[in-house]
Amino acid sequence: MNVKTKAAVIADEFTLLSVASIWDVCSLNRLNAIDQLKAFCPDLLFIESTWNGADGSWSNENRITSQLPLIQSLTEFCNQNNIPTVFWNKEDPVHFVDFSIRAKLTALFDIVFTTEVDCIARYKALLAHERVYFLPFFANTQTFYPKDLKRQSGYCFAGSWYEKYHERNNDFLHLYGLIKNSGASVNIFDRNHQKNIEGRTFPAEFQQSIVGNLPYTEIDKAYSGYETGISLNIVKNGQTMFARRAVELLASGTAVVSNYTRAMRVLFGELVDTVSLYDDKIHRTSCDTSER
């Protein structure tokens, strides 16, 4: 009988659901995190670069970057009780400064993981130790696998529009235009659909393709329900940083088309069709059934 690792976790919903079937998880709420930690007595404290937390208690002014004394109390309890502490920055290099320099969070942990190998040397220099490692996004194959569903032709995108990331937006506009000009359909599951969040509303040219939203607990229906999925990346020049949806789509047996980034070529090679602003067509539109 395999005994699951008991992990006290502060993470956003996507990561929490990814590890929930792997670990015995206690998701720490900001309001009573210390009491939860003591009562649960975990084998591991795992905290990621969190923006909301699975329950929303770590959002806005209460983000972990503003909760240094509380995070320090958690790590001190773990140190006193020989419980290893791990921090994962899942958004390197974009938010390296936010979590490691401004908030000084990473210095509190025994081990630091990063999604970008090019940041490892920076962490080691900053922290003055060698316990820094690469941890990429991963797919939980209990959730993401090729399902026996009738796949819709065309493309799906499940995610957000970020007004501030101009290069990503230009890539999406170009990719979207290529798809539409080919006669194929695009269905967009907008993570912020009807939330009216400033800077998160898709421009007018995308509105005809928006079909609503799916909670992350149901996103596998989209990833397994289409011939092809669209992935978009913010980081263009990193060796290993990519959007989580790429690996979840691949695990679902779905063809992936993405904006061109260094990491997509380094890690996935020909598995993913990468399209740059210089391309005038999409090279592959679906997986062969035998590849799923």
Regions found by a protein language model. Name each.
Residues 68-81, 104-105, 178:
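Catalytic-core regions built around general acid/base machinery
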Residues 100-110, 223:
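A conserved, positively charged/aromatic
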Residues 90-103, 138-141:
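Nucleotide-sugar donor phosphate/pyrophosphate-binding loop at the beta->alpha transition
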Residues 4, 78-89:
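Short beta-strand/loop segments at the ligand-binding rim of alpha/beta enzyme cores
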Residues 1-40, 49-58, 66-70, 111-270:
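Nucleotide-sugar donor-binding catalytic core of glycosyltransferases
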Residues 287-292:
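A charged, aromatic-enriched C-terminal amphipathic alpha-helix characteristic of glycosyltransferases
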Residues 43-44, 60:
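Secondary-structure boundary/capping micro-motif
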